[in-house]
């Protein structure tokens, strides 16, 4: 029995030794693999970091180049806009000068024409006023002359009639009634003559 137990113990020890050996091999292999994996990971990380740095630098350079291009484009656009605006201002100023010159010339012509028209109208008005004044004076003179002549004729006629009546009365002094009638007729004739002269 003891041998059976010794055998079992021997086998158990042998199995344990095999197991420990196997475990040691597995552990060593695992350690090697872990170390190798760690090295690879570290290398990959370093490579990635280097690549990342390179990418970062490249991105930075590209961004700088894009910024410079954008700045150049903006400056060119600004210059072009400024040039266009200046050209527009120059054109507007030139157009304004031309328009101002044209309007000034037209205004001067209009002023001159208005002055000529006003002068002609003033001259015509003065001529018309002078003609009217002359006509009025001539009419007044003519009317006064006609009235004076008529008045003198009436007076002459009245005097002549009076003399004739007096002469007639002087011949027939004894007819007193006729004398009164003749005086009345002479007065009536003189009054009628004065009324006629006033109407003219």
Swiss-Prot record:
Q: Name a single GO biological process.
A: positive regulation of response to water deprivation
Q: In which tissues is it expressed?
A: Expressed in the shoot apex and leaves.
Q: Where is the composition biased (Low complexity)?
A: 115-130, 186-200
> Which spans does this entry mark as compositional bias, Basic and acidic residues?
13-23, 30-42, 53-81, 88-97, 105-114, 172-183
Additional note from the record: Plants overexpressing LEA19 display enhanced drought resistance under field conditions.
Residues annotated as coiled-coil are: 52-81
Alphabetical keyword list:
Coiled coil, Stress response
Q: Where is the composition biased (Polar residues)?
A: 145-156
Give the source's domain of life in one word: Eukaryota
Q: What is this protein called?
A: Late embryogenesis abundant protein 19
Region annotation Disordered: where it falls in the sequence: 1-158, 172-200
- Physiological role: Involved in response to drought stress.
The UniProt induction remark is: In seedling roots and seedling leaves, induced by salt stress. In seedling roots induced by abscisic acid (ABA). Induced by cold stress.
The similarity comment for this entry is: Belongs to the LEA type 4 family.
Q: Species lineage, top-down? A: Eukaryota, Viridiplantae, Streptophyta, Embryophyta, Tracheophyta
An example of a Gene Ontology cellular component annotation for this protein is: nucleus
Source organism (scientific name): Oryza sativa subsp. indica
Q: Where does the sequence pass through the membrane? A: none
């Amino acid at each position: 029995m003891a041998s059976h137990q010794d055998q079992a113990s021997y086998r158990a020890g042998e199995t344990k030794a095999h197991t420990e050996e196997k475990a040691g091999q597995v552990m060593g292999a695992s350690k090697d693999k872990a170390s190798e994996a760690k090295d690879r990971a570290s290398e990959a990380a370093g490579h990635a970091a280097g690549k990342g740095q390179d990418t970062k630098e490249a991105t930075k350079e590209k961004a700088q180049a894009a910024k410079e291009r954008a700045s150049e484009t903006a400056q060119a656009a600004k210059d072009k806009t400024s040039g266009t605006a200046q050209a527009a201002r120059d054109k507007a100023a030139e157009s304004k000068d031309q328009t101002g010159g044209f309007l000034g010339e037209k205004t001067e012509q209009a002023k001159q024409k208005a002055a000529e028209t006003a002068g002609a109208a003033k001259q015509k008005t003065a001529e018309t006023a002078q003609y009217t004044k002359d006509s009025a004076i001539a009419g007044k003179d003519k009317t006064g002359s006609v009235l004076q002549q008529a008045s003198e004729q009436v007076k002459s006629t009245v005097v002549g009639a009076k003399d004739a009546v007096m002469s007639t009365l002087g011949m027939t002094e004894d007819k007193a009634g006729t004398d009164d009638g003749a005086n009345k007729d002479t007065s009536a004739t003189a009054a009628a003559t004065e009324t006629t002269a006033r109407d003219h």
